[in-house]
């Protein structure tokens, strides 16, 4: 790739529970290279670090699970924190900036396992697969957690029902009650509309043995 102005698409790949972002990056590079697309596609593989991986006091960090729900980071030394979703927002915003990437038309956000949960939840923050005239595609691979857009749940007898005597089942990230600070800014109704507006691709692998 000689210049970012030549980039036509971007892939943001989200790691799983073990947060091995480098492995995900390498695998995606291998796939793109095999399709002769390495000059057209930009690959980004962010890592959500923990306290013990901080290299600077200003680094934001999460515990081993909070990042996948889009929750706030722990405060850095100056008291600032940020939602994990906001970090992806900043990447998407830059990629959709035509002054920076004039030919970029499509962004794929994909995740595996815990990363799949992240992508699934994050899809409820955008409307109709579009951001600043850039197409956003969501790919959810081997997800184990799902956001429900209303308070009903599918029972073993095939019926839908609101659960009784269970106060937490519909709270974020499993439902739209008691939303995280980031999702609260979007609001319950907008989140629900976003959820139904997007096309999201779901994949399940029978031999999924890694996180």
Predicted regions and their residues:
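The feature captures the conserved acid-bearing segment of alpha/beta-hydrolase catalytic domains
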Residues: 131-211
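Short glycine-enriched nucleophile-adjacent loop
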Residues: 28-29, 116-129
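Active-site machinery of serine-nucleophile hydrolases
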Residues: 17-91, 136-144
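Short beta-strand-to-loop junctions in surface cap/lid or active-site-entrance loops
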Residues: 1-7, 189-193
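Eukaryote-skewed repeat-based solenoidal scaffolds used as protein-protein interaction platforms
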Residues: 96, 105-107, 111, 123, ...
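Gly/Ser-rich "nucleophile elbow"/oxyanion-hole loop immediately N-terminal to the catalytic nucleophile
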Residues: 2, 69-109, 114
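Short beta-strand element of the alpha/beta-hydrolase
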Residues: 6-17
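Hydrophobic/aromatic beta-strand patches that form the interior of the parallel beta-sheet core
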Residues: 12, 42-44, 110, 139, ...
